[in-house]
Amino acid sequence: METTRSIGSTTRAVPCAPASFRIDPALVFSSGFLATLVITTVMLLLLWFGVAQVDLPIWVSRLFVSDPVKVQAVGLGIHLTMGLAFAWVFALVEPQLRFSPSQNGLIFGVVLWAMVQAIGVPTLSAVAALIRADDSVFAGWFASRLGVGAAMASLVAHLAYGVSLGVVYGRQRNR
C-alpha cells in the first residue's frame, strides 16, 4: 500500500503499512515463545535420534563462559531471546506476504535458515576458531564441514519454527 506525502514542493508515493496494521506485543511474545518451544523440541528429538546439530546459542555461550552448566543456561537464554526477536521480525514482515499463515511461516523459516547457515554459522564458528586458535571448529558455509545432516537438521528445525510461528501468529492476527 502506498500513500502520498508532500515534502517541500515535491509529492512522492511512500510505501507504508495498511492503516489497520498493528502489532500486538502479547501475540508476538506468545507466538514467538511457542515457536521457540517447537524448534527446541524438534532439535532435541533430532539429537535423541543421533542427528548432528548446529547449535549456535551454545557456540556463542562458550565464547563467554566455560562452566558446562553455565554454558547450557546462557545458551538457553540466547536461544529464547533469538526466538522472540525473530518473532518480532516476522510480525513486521508478515503483513507484506500474501500467502496463507502456514505458507508465510514456511517462507520465513526457509529464509531464516538460509541466513543462519550463510552468515551465522560461518561467522560464529570462525570467531570460535580464532579465539581457540583451532581451525577444526570452523563449520563452514551451510555447516559444510559438519556434514549434510547438520544443515538438514537445522532446516527441519527452522521449518518447524516458521510454520508454527506463521500458524499461531498469522491466524490470530487475522481474526
Which positions does each model-derived feature cover?
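Juxtamembrane/disordered regions of integral membrane proteins
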Residues: E2-R175
